[in-house]
Amino acid sequence: MGRHALLSASSSHRWLACPPSARLCENYEDMGSEYAQQGTDAHSLCEHKLKALLGMETKEPTEELEFYDEEMEECACGYAEYVLSLVEEAKKECKDPVVLIEQRLDFSRYVEEGFGTGDCVIIADGTLYIVDYKHGKGVEVSAEGNPQMMLYALGALELFDGIYDIDTVRMAIYQPRRENVSVYAMAKDELLKWAEGELSEKAKLAYAGEGEFCAGEHCKFCLSLIHISEPTRLQLIS
């Protein structure tokens, strides 16, 4: 299995709100769940469908997917078609936009040892597109002010900003089981201001296991809550 970052993009909503939770959760093993495996399977299928649509080499994964079904097939096809529409949009700005699928993105300039994997990154002259697939249907996810997406964007800027002179970042979340496509655009300078200010400050606290504990909605995703009583857990997240 691949190494997971202490301060990952996917857990950033939690550790930005509650910095010491990062080191606290380090003491507990993530046992996973059926929902997590469904998401993993869906991402594998999305990757395959998108590569096939773009004419890239790929291998049909369905026989190895534990939770593959007709709904997942429809979701993955819809995702691939949506990303293709963004590629066509990018071609209006750049003849040959770069499309990266399941790309490792390093944002350690701002977050110690920080990295993550972007579902799809599209780079065109002036504009960076970050696309994230969400298979869950419990909570509708917004791209606006979404720290996971913003961290992915920072990682992509590290790779391509000097080549493509990017000035705008467009972030899109595709969440078909909630019929949700959320898109948010921000200026690169605005993103960098956040990275050099709030993000860097909170990341330093989180990496050191310092800062104030802060209860809230983010507690739902805290591994340490597995080991406390149900009444206390409900009290924290209410």
Predicted segment positions?
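Metal-dependent nuclease catalytic cores that hydrolyze phosphodiester bonds in DNA/RNA
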Residues: 1-128
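Short cysteine clusters
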Residues: 18, 219-222
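Single conserved hydrophobic/aromatic residue that forms the stacking wall/gate
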Residues: 226-238
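Short strand-connecting beta-turns/loops that link adjacent beta-strands
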Residues: 125-127, 224, 233
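Phosphate/oxyanion-binding loops and surfaces in catalytic or ligand/nucleic-acid-binding neighborhoods
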Residues: 48-52, 159, 202, 225
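Mg2+/Mn2+-dependent nuclease catalytic core
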Residues: 37, 95-205
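Short, well-structured alpha-helical interface segments that form or flank functional binding sites
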Residues: 115, 147, 214-217, 231
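Immediate flanking context of iron-sulfur cluster ligation sites
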Residues: 205-218
